Amino acid sequence: MSNQLNTMDIKEIMNSLPHRYPFLLIDRVLDYTPGETLHAIKNVTINEPFFQGHFPIQPVMPGVLILEAMAQATGLLAYKTMEAAVTDDSLYYFAGIDKARFKRVVEPGDQLHFEVKMVKERRGIGVFTGVVKVDGELVCSAEIMCARREIKK
């Protein structure tokens, strides 16, 4: 049994997701097992564009962007599970969210750790669970659905 980790750097992430700055919210994948789990990180800095207005006096990362980042992590797991890439003829779309809960704010200097698990996949629709932590402390948890759809050319 190998202890080698399956990692992804930013180049491979950009080959697997259609998102680009300022909406690419995953910096690195630390490990993944296709069809099972993915662990990724996002380094949050004061230079993030959303901090200009949310909130200038007390910068806090918007919860919807934490969920979007979690959805991007599930998209990476889906692409790796299906051995697909953004250059193929389909995209994974954020299709639904349930049981989203926030437990802690995210501030500049935090490093988000995403842990997503594939629950099931059927007919191009994937169901995932995810948690986000900072320094081991729970930030957010949710169930996310994403749907694979062909790109119309």
From Swiss-Prot:
Compartment list? Cytoplasm
Q: Which SUPFAM superfamilies match?
A: Thioesterase/thiol ester dehydrase-isomerase
Q: What Gene Ontology biological process does one annotation of this record name?
A: fatty acid biosynthetic process
Q: Does the keyword DNA repair apply?
A: no
Predominant localisation class: cytoplasm
What keywords are assigned to this protein? Cytoplasm, Lipid A biosynthesis, Lipid biosynthesis, Lipid metabolism, Lyase
Task: Quote the EC number.
Answer: 4.2.1.59
- Gene Ontology CC terms, in alphabetical order: cytoplasm; membrane
- InterPro entries in the record, alphabetically? FabA_FabZ, FabZ, HotDog_dom_sf
Q: Does the keyword Lipid metabolism apply?
A: yes
Which GO molecular function annotations are given, in alphabetical order?
Answer: (3R)-hydroxyacyl-[acyl-carrier-protein] dehydratase activity
What Pfam families does the entry give?
A: FabA
Q: Tell me which residues this entry annotates as catalytic.
A: 54
Enzymatic reactions: a (3R)-hydroxyacyl-[ACP] = a (2E)-enoyl-[ACP] + H2O
Q: Which NCBIfam families match?
A: fabZ, PRK00006.1
Protein's job: Involved in unsaturated fatty acids biosynthesis. Catalyzes the dehydration of short chain beta-hydroxyacyl-ACPs and long chain saturated and unsaturated beta-hydroxyacyl-ACPs.
Q: Which HAMAP family match?
A: FabZ
Family listed: Belongs to the thioester dehydratase family. FabZ subfamily.
Protein's recorded name: 3-hydroxyacyl-[acyl-carrier-protein] dehydratase FabZ
Source species of the chain? Shewanella sediminis (strain HAW-EB3)
